[in-house]
């Protein structure tokens, strides 16, 4: 599929998604598959979770738009799915949801020789992140934090 057609298809599908209060995160067209696979990753514009029903409901109008556009001149399989959970914690909701979970904190090393700290997510405030490292609470100022990701802890 030509890049121009993919871009046109993306524009059309974004309009359909907007009508359903959805946002398209990505469209991947796998022309090396037989039949061609069109994968669309969606999320809700209000930040709520995507359900299986949301994906199913979006499938029909998305498929209709693809058919009416005549941009795909071959048989295809349409897959609609959610963005899924990212390992990186960014929103306040993430920090509330994953309180007590193991995290890896990447540090900027401005004030520390360590690159990473691992522990259990304890608390997030406006100024700092607190993690539990082997029973001791460590407060890390946010200006020292580059990234916070979920991880698995080893003894």
UniProtKB/Swiss-Prot annotation:
GO terms for biological process: ribosomal small subunit assembly; translation. InterPro entries: Ribosome_maturation_RimP (IPR003728), RimP_C_sf (IPR036847), RimP_N (IPR028989), RimP_N_sf (IPR035956). Belongs to the RimP family. SUPFAM superfamilies: YhbC-like, C-terminal domain, YhbC-like, N-terminal domain. The gene is rimP. Required for maturation of 30S ribosomal subunits. Keywords: Cytoplasm, Ribosome biogenesis. It comes from the Bacteria. One of its GO terms (cellular component) is cytosol. It comes from Prochlorococcus marinus (strain MIT 9215). It is found in: Cytoplasm. It holds the Pfam family RimP_N. This is Ribosome maturation factor RimP. HAMAP family: RimP.
């Amino acid at each position: 599929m030509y890049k121009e057609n993919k871009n046109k298809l993306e524009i059309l599908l974004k309009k359909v998604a907007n009508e359903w209060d959805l946002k398209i995160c990505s469209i991947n067209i796998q022309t090396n598959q037989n039949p061609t696979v069109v994968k669309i990753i969606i999320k809700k514009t209000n930040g709520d979770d995507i359900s299986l029903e949301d994906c199913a409901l979006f499938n029909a109008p998305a498929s209709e738009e693809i058919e009416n556009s005549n941009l795909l001149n071959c048989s295809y399989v349409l897959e609609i799915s959610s963005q899924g959970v990212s390992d990186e914690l960014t929103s306040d909701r993430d920090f509330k949801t994953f309180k007590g979970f193991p995290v890896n904190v990447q540090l900027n090393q401005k004030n520390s020789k360590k690159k990473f700290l691992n522990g259990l997510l304890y608390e997030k405030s406006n100024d700092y992140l607190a993690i539990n490292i082997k029973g001791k609470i460590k407060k890390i100022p946010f200006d020292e934090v580059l990234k916070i990701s979920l991880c698995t802890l080893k003894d």
